[in-house]
Curated annotation (Swiss-Prot):
This is Queuine tRNA-ribosyltransferase. Catalyzes the base-exchange of a guanine (G) residue with the queuine precursor 7-aminomethyl-7-deazaguanine (PreQ1) at position 34 (anticodon wobble position) in tRNAs with GU(N) anticodons (tRNA-Asp, -Asn, -His and -Tyr). Catalysis occurs through a double-displacement mechanism. The nucleophile active site attacks the C1' of nucleotide 34 to detach the guanine base from the RNA, forming a covalent enzyme-RNA intermediate. The proton acceptor active site deprotonates the incoming PreQ1, allowing a nucleophilic attack on the C1' of the ribose to form the product. PANTHER family: QUEUINE TRNA-RIBOSYLTRANSFERASE (PTHR46499:SF1). It comes from Cereibacter sphaeroides (strain ATCC 17029 / ATH 2.4.9). The active site is at D93, D267. Substrate binds at D93, S94, G95, G96, F97, D147, Q190, G217.
Length: 376
């Protein structure tokens, strides 16, 4: 197994790419979807079951873990991999997005952000240096630079000022990260939906130099059309020989569109959160298992799916246990959703390698257009 971090492109089809990220903890096949293990767990899933869905890498959250159980405690207990029983790669975000969206009484300065915990009101400070320290204590394989995520809508001037602050923080993150063989630091492009700002941000990040590059500040309410508009040009501003990570995306059609535009990595809470709220993602779109139409339906969620929920349980059973608020409902629906997402990624990788992505995407949209199977 390699002792360093590397990325190899193995095939392209149009702007879409497939390849392999190599780390000391294993390979990550791209395009990759990363399930989110916010507080050291993918909710309702055992780590070995997450792996069984086909996931090569998980995402952990700096903000949540620094507050509870604390990064120092995780480090004393052997690091996040041992703590949560996941021996594959882990990517941790920098905490910036959660500070801006969850924390109370934020105070932003050139130095960093002071905020109060949304859990108990305790006061904390995050800076590029502290974020790098926390992620080092956690032991993550891929570390994200500390950035500011401006709330949208915002004026172009406000977005520009925020982006330039993030670029100064990116340089400080790079310096604080130091020399850590086998670990990678990703810079985060910002700039909202303005092409010139995105290009300026990418140029600043390339000058600093990172092992990978993220596209941040999207999937925050701007809509799919605006997001795809940015993705039509933003990946092209980044080095071809480094992974490109679109943060916080998303829905299956968002993922397919992002991959078509040259994105290599994505993460989102959607498949696990949807499972806990009775929503299943299938080849033919979304299924709301709460609906009464499923009450007497002996058929699986998706007859073509090989996950445990589809292999062994009916829609009627899933409807029943969800309505009865049984824990197994969250377990089975989350497993199904994560399995569906990983099957989608494998389909995209195979299609790109074969030069048949256009056919795959057409079939994907055709199946979704059919809608769910007819009620009995």
């Amino acid at each position: 197994m390699t002792q360093r971090f590397s990325f190899e492109l193995t095939a392209t089809d149009g702007r879409a790419r497939t390849g392999v990220i190599s780390t000391p903890r294993g390979e990550i096949r791209t395009p990759a979807f990363m399930p989110v293990g916010t507080a050291g767990t993918v909710k309702a899933m055992l780590p070995e079951n997450v792996r069984a869905t086909g996931a090569d890498i998980l995402l952990g959250n700096t903000y949540h873990l620094m507050l509870r159980p604390t990064a120092e405690r995780v480090a004393r207990l052997g690091g996040l991999h041992r703590f949560m029983n996941w021996d594959r790669p882990i990517l941790t975000d920098s905490g910036g997005f959660q500070v801006m969206s969850l924390a109370d009484l934020r105070k932003l300065s050139e130095e960093g952000v002071t905020f109060r915990s949304h859990i108990d009101g305790s006061k904390h400070h995050l800076s590029p240096e502290r974020s790098m320290e926390i992620q080092r204590l956690l032991g993550s394989d891929i570390v994200m630079a500390f950035d500011e995520c401006p709330a949208l809508p915002a004026t172009e001037e406000a977005v520009a000022q925020s982006m330039r602050l993030s670029m100064r923080w990116a340089r400080r993150s790079r310096e604080a990260f130091g020399d850590r063989p086998g670990h990678a630091l990703f810079g985060i492009m910002q700039g909202g939906v303005t092409r010139d700002l995105r290009e300026e941000s990418a140029a600043a990040l390339r000058e600093i130099g990172f092992e990978g590059y993220a596209i941040g500040g999207l999937a925050v309410g701007e809509g799919q059309e605006a997001m795809f508009g940015v993705l039509d040009y933003a990946p092209g501003f980044l080095p071809e020989d480094r992974p490109r990570y679109l943060m916080g995306v998303g829905k299956p059609d968002d993922i397919v569109g992002a991959v078509e535009r040259g994105v290599d990595m994505m993460d989102c809470v959607l498949p696990s959160r949807s499972g806990r709220t009775g929503q299943a993602w299938t080849r033919r779109g979304q299924v709301n298992i709460k609906n009464a139409r499923h009450m007497d339906d002996p058929r699986p969620l998706d007859e073509a799916c090989s996950c445990p929920a589809c292999r062994s349980y009916s829609r009627a059973y899933l409807h029943h246990v969800f309505r009865a608020q049984e824990i197994i409902a969250s377990m089975l629906l989350t497993w199904h959703n994560l399995h569906y997402y990983q099957e989608l990624m494998q389909g995209l990788r195979t299609a790109i390698a074969a030069g048949r992505l256009g056919e795959f995407v057409a079939a994907f949209h055709a199946a979704r257009a059919e809608g769910d199977i007819e009620p009995l």
